[in-house]
């Protein structure tokens, strides 16, 4: 008798995606982050749903409704901090997932990669709008500063900003629409994830060597399901340590002050996971130039397949490219640090140098080194 999981119309899809899926036998722990991102998304949707049951998207009551969740709702504090720190875990997994893709040349799967970059943009938009909802000082001023950047667009900029605001400043209309978008976007992200997986399963997974692994495949279950469960347990452990011991470690103290349009905080900065892009934005003195650099700092990921000059797919056997990759990682950490610092000497010049280095490594150095490595192969 044929197994139900192989014949049932719905079970069949699950079976081909998570059970009988042929996976390369040598994929390392770096391939765990896809499933961890799925776990993060599910957790964020679930905790977000429970928060939305008690939250009010009104400027007069938003801040106090978050306080009410933390003080009066059963385990409200836990749900709130799981949601806030869950976003941080989400971005840690995202950055590691993207980094893995860059290191092992997974970007040669064009469709999967480009959908992934669109997903990154969608998650960043979701996180930004979520940060505005508690209506603290940093929520309000973060929303004001970031939305105001659109006014740099020639001719239609000012009209566009006022249209997004729903008035002449960030106010009730802005908060309400941000809440609506913050609620709907994760479901759009979930739909895009399905498309991401659809394209991935057309080609099959990449592996650390970057070689075709059709001759050496093993079933996803039980080998990689058990491996993913281990990753999930470590993720939950890290998250719960963060939530239960230092829930405000990654937050901003200014957000415990209710939003006040008449009082600007001394240092306006976004959450830590946006600091690298914020540093690139601030490093350019021109407003429009800064906005373009900000967008391009993420959009540049889409150009990686075009910039791939090496005869080898993965960086596993390319020590020179490996050096550049880790310099790029160090550069991104430097940008993250600079994004959280005030705009004064020596941080300005460090930020500018780190921004130049970021684009130089990706656009010039990696392709050049790849060509040199191709030459070295002939020796």
UniProtKB/Swiss-Prot annotation:
<feature type="transmembrane region" description="Helical">
    <location>
        <begin position="77"/>
        <end position="98"/>
    </location>
</feature>
<feature type="transmembrane region" description="Helical">
    <location>
        <begin position="33"/>
        <end position="53"/>
    </location>
</feature>
<feature type="binding site" description="axial binding residue">
    <location>
        <position position="196"/>
    </location>
    <ligand>
        <name>heme b b566</name>
    </ligand>
</feature>
<dbReference type="InterPro" id="IPR005798">
    <property type="entry name" value="Cyt_b/b6_C"/>
</dbReference>
<keyword id="KW-0999">Mitochondrion inner membrane</keyword>
<feature type="transmembrane region" description="Helical">
    <location>
        <begin position="113"/>
        <end position="133"/>
    </location>
</feature>
<dbReference type="GO" id="GO:0008121">
    <property type="term" value="F:ubiquinol-cytochrome-c reductase activity"/>
</dbReference>
<feature type="transmembrane region" description="Helical">
    <location>
        <begin position="288"/>
        <end position="308"/>
    </location>
</feature>
<dbReference type="Pfam" id="PF00032">
    <property type="entry name" value="Cytochrom_B_C"/>
</dbReference>
<keyword id="KW-0408">Iron</keyword>
<keyword id="KW-0812">Transmembrane</keyword>
<dbReference type="GO" id="GO:0006122">
    <property type="term" value="P:mitochondrial electron transport, ubiquinol to cytochrome c"/>
</dbReference>
<dbReference type="GO" id="GO:0005743">
    <property type="term" value="C:mitochondrial inner membrane"/>
</dbReference>
<feature type="binding site">
    <location>
        <position position="201"/>
    </location>
    <ligand>
        <name>a ubiquinone</name>
    </ligand>
</feature>
<keyword id="KW-0679">Respiratory chain</keyword>
<comment type="function">
    <text>Component of the ubiquinol-cytochrome c reductase complex (complex III or cytochrome b-c1 complex) that is part of the mitochondrial respiratory chain. The b-c1 complex mediates electron transfer from ubiquinol to cytochrome c. Contributes to the generation of a proton gradient across the mitochondrial membrane that is then used for ATP synthesis.</text>
</comment>
<feature type="transmembrane region" description="Helical">
    <location>
        <begin position="178"/>
        <end position="198"/>
    </location>
</feature>
<keyword id="KW-0472">Membrane</keyword>
<keyword id="KW-0830">Ubiquinone</keyword>
<keyword id="KW-0349">Heme</keyword>
<dbReference type="InterPro" id="IPR030689">
    <property type="entry name" value="Cytochrome_b"/>
</dbReference>
<dbReference type="InterPro" id="IPR016174">
    <property type="entry name" value="Di-haem_cyt_TM"/>
</dbReference>
<feature type="transmembrane region" description="Helical">
    <location>
        <begin position="226"/>
        <end position="246"/>
    </location>
</feature>
<dbReference type="InterPro" id="IPR036150">
    <property type="entry name" value="Cyt_b/b6_C_sf"/>
</dbReference>
<dbReference type="InterPro" id="IPR005797">
    <property type="entry name" value="Cyt_b/b6_N"/>
</dbReference>
<feature type="binding site" description="axial binding residue">
    <location>
        <position position="182"/>
    </location>
    <ligand>
        <name>heme b b562</name>
    </ligand>
</feature>
<dbReference type="InterPro" id="IPR048260">
    <property type="entry name" value="Cytochrome_b_C_euk/bac"/>
</dbReference>
<keyword id="KW-0479">Metal-binding</keyword>
<comment type="similarity">
    <text>Belongs to the cytochrome b family.</text>
</comment>
<dbReference type="GO" id="GO:0045275">
    <property type="term" value="C:respiratory chain complex III"/>
</dbReference>
<keyword id="KW-0813">Transport</keyword>
<feature type="transmembrane region" description="Helical">
    <location>
        <begin position="320"/>
        <end position="340"/>
    </location>
</feature>
<keyword id="KW-0249">Electron transport</keyword>
<dbReference type="InterPro" id="IPR048259">
    <property type="entry name" value="Cytochrome_b_N_euk/bac"/>
</dbReference>
<keyword id="KW-1133">Transmembrane helix</keyword>
<dbReference type="InterPro" id="IPR027387">
    <property type="entry name" value="Cytb/b6-like_sf"/>
</dbReference>
<dbReference type="Pfam" id="PF00033">
    <property type="entry name" value="Cytochrome_B"/>
</dbReference>
<protein>
    <recommendedName>
        <fullName>Cytochrome b</fullName>
    </recommendedName>
</protein>
<comment type="subunit">
    <text>The cytochrome bc1 complex contains 11 subunits: 3 respiratory subunits (MT-CYB, CYC1 and UQCRFS1), 2 core proteins (UQCRC1 and UQCRC2) and 6 low-molecular weight proteins (UQCRH/QCR6, UQCRB/QCR7, UQCRQ/QCR8, UQCR10/QCR9, UQCR11/QCR10 and a cleavage product of UQCRFS1). This cytochrome bc1 complex then forms a dimer.</text>
</comment>
<feature type="binding site" description="axial binding residue">
    <location>
        <position position="97"/>
    </location>
    <ligand>
        <name>heme b b566</name>
    </ligand>
</feature>
<dbReference type="GO" id="GO:0046872">
    <property type="term" value="F:metal ion binding"/>
</dbReference>
<feature type="binding site" description="axial binding residue">
    <location>
        <position position="83"/>
    </location>
    <ligand>
        <name>heme b b562</name>
    </ligand>
</feature>
């Amino acid at each position: 008798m044929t197994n139900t999981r192989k014949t049932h119309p719905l079970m069949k899809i699950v079976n081909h995606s998570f059970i009988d899926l042929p996976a390369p036998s040598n994929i390392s722990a770096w391939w765990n982050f896809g499933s961890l991102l799925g776990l993060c998304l599910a957790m964020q949707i679930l905790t977000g749903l429970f928060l939305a049951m008690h939250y009010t998207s009104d400027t007069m009551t938003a801040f106090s409704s978050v306080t009410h969740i933390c003080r009066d709702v059963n385990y409200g504090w836990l749900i709130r901090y799981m949601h806030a720190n869950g976003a941080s875990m989400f971005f840690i997994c995202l950055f590691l997932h993207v980094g893995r893709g860059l290191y092992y040349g997974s970007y040669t799967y064009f469709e999967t990669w480009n959908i992934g970059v669109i997903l990154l943009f969608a998650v960043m938009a979701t996180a930004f709008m979520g940060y505005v909802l508690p209506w603290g000082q940093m929520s309000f001023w973060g929303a004001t500063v970031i939305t105001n950047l659109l006014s740099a667009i020639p001719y239609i900029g000012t009209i566009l900003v006022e249209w997004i605001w729903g008035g002449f400043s960030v106010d009730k209309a802005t908060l309400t629409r941000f809440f609506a978008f913050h609620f709907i976007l994760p479901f759009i992200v979930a739909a895009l994830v399905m498309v991401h997986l659809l394209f991935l399963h057309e080609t099959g997974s990449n592996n650390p060597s970057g070689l075709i692994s059709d001759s050496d495949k093993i079933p996803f279950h039980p080998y990689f399901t058990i491996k993913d469960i281990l990753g999930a347990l470590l993720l939950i452990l890290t998250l719960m340590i963060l939530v239960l011991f230092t829930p405000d470690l990654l937050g901003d103290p200014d957000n415990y002050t209710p939003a006040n349009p008449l009082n600007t905080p001394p240092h306006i900065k976004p959450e830590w996971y946006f600091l690298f892009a914020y540093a690139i934005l601030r490093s350019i003195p021109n407003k429009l130039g800064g906005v373009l650099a900000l967008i391009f700092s993420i959009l540049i990921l889409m150009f990686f397949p075009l910039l791939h000059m090496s005869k080898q797919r993965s960086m596993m056997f390319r020590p020179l490219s490996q050096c550049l990759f880790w310099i790029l990682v160090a550069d991104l950490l430097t940008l993250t640090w600079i994004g959280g610092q005030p705009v004064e000497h020596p941080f300005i010049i460090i930020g500018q140098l780190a921004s130049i280095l970021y684009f130089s490594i990706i656009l010039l150095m990696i392709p050049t080194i790849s060509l040199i490595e191709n030459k070295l192969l002939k020796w």
